[in-house]
Amino acid sequence: MTHTLRVIFAGTPEFAAAALAAIHEAGFPVPLVLTQPDRPAGRGMKLQASAVKRYAVEHGIPVAQPPSLRRAGKYPGEAADAIELLRTTPHDVMVVAAYGLLLPQEVLDIPRAGCINIHASLLPRWRGAAPIHRAIEAGDAETGVTLMQMDVGLDTGAMIEEARVAIAPDDTTATLHDRLAADGARLIVDALVRLERDGALPATPQPADGVTYAEKIGKHEAALDWRKPADVLARQVRAFDPFPGGVATLDGAAIKLWAAEPVAARGDAVPGTIVDAAPEGVIVACGSGALRVTQLQKPGGKRLPAREFLAGSPLAAGQRFALPDGA
């Protein structure tokens, strides 16, 4: 089906690329894509295009990569050029998903139908940069995707529609991300169809109660504090897959833990102490309960099931993982 509603798209990672693909494949004209500049990544730290840019280039969609859209920011010239490009590119609405750049009021005012954001949480809970990670880390039973009409606040715009998603006990950020990306793609296509048909989308202001913020994940958060309860640490491991991973330091080596589950405590071992190292999992004492770690990765190695990890890097009861620096 061919549509007439013209959509400028702004986004960067895979979550956004899923939405761009759905919009494009649904037949909406996409005259321009905005995405962040190429960044160094991987072992060789070579410049890598974003997932959104890769899709746009593959499908012949024009791409712009301004480092900023704020005239008063660090890149005023580039911002001015990008804003002029937006003004001179005929379009009706802008869709924004995990773009990573702030949109000033000047930009929000350019599209006739405004800017619609796809946010990976049930707003107003988990506004901010890392809503999927924080929902798992906090032990939320459900999360979802919200479409909102953007304003200059941080994810404060009026809500157009939402989809709810249960968080499974074994969900990681990676697995939950994929389901939310699919839901976001479906929601935005449905919303654009209605916008084209009706000329506007009803939106409801966010409630004042229940606001929380999902701060960006930092590498410093990766270190496991074994004094915490086992269920808290298990959620941390799941929340930090694929980035930055849960990290446990043993004899100066940072071992990444990728899968773990809380189990009953065994004895009264000091938190961080390995109480059993079996093929089924490495059991580590925690502040309350214990953690069975079933997937590990040594420095420079690959993720391995506990059985394979122990075959090449034996661990033994009585060894103790260090507490985080400053603990």
UniProtKB/Swiss-Prot annotation:
The gene designation is fmt
| CDD domains assigned | FMT_core_Met-tRNA-FMT_N (cd08646), Met_tRNA_FMT_C (cd08704)
Q: Name one Pfam family in it.
A: Formyl_trans_C
The intrachain disulfides are none
What are its GO cellular component terms?
A: cytosol
A GO molecular function held by the record: methionyl-tRNA formyltransferase activity
Which species does the entry assign this protein to? Burkholderia ambifaria (strain MC40-6)
Task: Name it.
Answer: Methionyl-tRNA formyltransferase
Kindly report, in one word, the top-level EC class recorded for this enzyme.
transferase
Q: What keyword terms does UniProt attach to this protein?
A: Protein biosynthesis, Transferase
InterPro entries recorded: Fmt, Formyl_trans_C, Formyl_trans_C_sf, Formyl_transf_N, Formyl_transf_N_sf, Formyl_transferase-like_C_sf, GART_AS, Met-tRNA-FMT_C
PROSITE patterns the UniProt entry points to: GART
Which reaction(s) does its UniProt entry say it catalyses? Answer: L-methionyl-tRNA(fMet) + (6R)-10-formyltetrahydrofolate = N-formyl-L-methionyl-tRNA(fMet) + (6S)-5,6,7,8-tetrahydrofolate + H(+)
Phylogenetic classification of the source organism: Bacteria, Pseudomonadati, Pseudomonadota, Betaproteobacteria, Burkholderiales
Instruction: Sum up the protein's function in the record's words.
Output: Attaches a formyl group to the free amino group of methionyl-tRNA(fMet). The formyl group appears to play a dual role in the initiator identity of N-formylmethionyl-tRNA by promoting its recognition by IF2 and preventing the misappropriation of this tRNA by the elongation apparatus.
Family the entry assigns? Belongs to the Fmt family.
